[in-house]
Structure formats: structure tokens, C-alpha cells
């Protein structure tokens, strides 16, 4: 875990960028599904969630540099403390598994 040393203004910009990227990536997933590219859709859905969770972590002054780190910190900070319902952790883990299956 790394505590982010950003100014409040910079942190807001990074969070905004990650959320915009999450939205664009989600739209890519929707387009992939419409065109029958299920594996690509799984990849894009995972990354949309990853960008959104990363934005959430950064907004709380946490930053991690790996996919597993994002998943673990999300669980540690938000799920174990019942800030976010655990069902969203399960969905995030399922998306990660689907991405791995589709990519490899």
C-alpha cells in the first residue's frame, strides 16, 4: 500500500480522470457485447471496474500499483469495514477471473 502524496486538487483531477476512463471503458464493453465479442467485453468490464475502484481508493488517499493490490485494498478498506456491500467485492473478483480466462 502506498499513501498518495497528491494535493487535494491533483487528487480530484486523478479521480475524475479515472472515473471518465472507467465510463469510456464500460462503453467499450457495451459495444463489444453488441458485436458479439464476449471475451473483449469481459476484459473491458473488468478494467472499467478496476479504474472505478482505483479512483475510489485514490479519493481516500490510497494507491496501489497492481491488479491484485487494488482487489486486496478494496477488500481491506471498504468491504471488511462494511462501507461497501460485500457483493460488489464478489462481482469485482468474478470480473477479474473472467478477464484472466478471456485474455489467457
Residue ranges and their predicted role:
Residues 1-104:
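Terminal alpha-helical segments
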Amino acid at each position: 500500500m502506498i499513501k498518495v502524496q497528491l494535493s487535494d486538487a491533483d487528487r480530484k483531477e486523478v479521480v475524475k480522470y479515472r472515473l471518465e476512463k472507467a465510463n469510456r471503458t464500460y462503453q467499450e464493453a457495451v459495444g463489444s457485447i453488441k458485436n458479439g465479442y464476449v471475451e473483449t467485453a469481459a476484459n473491458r468490464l473488468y478494467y472499467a471496474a478496476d479504474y472505478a475502484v482505483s479512483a475510489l481508493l485514490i479519493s481516500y488517499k490510497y494507491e496501489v500499483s497492481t491488479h491484485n493490490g487494488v482487489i486486496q485494498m478494496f477488500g481491506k478498506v471498504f468491504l471488511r469495514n462494511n462501507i461497501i456491500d460485500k457483493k460488489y467485492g464478489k462481482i469485482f473478483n468474478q470480473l477479474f477471473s473472467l478477464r484472466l480466462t478471456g485474455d489467457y
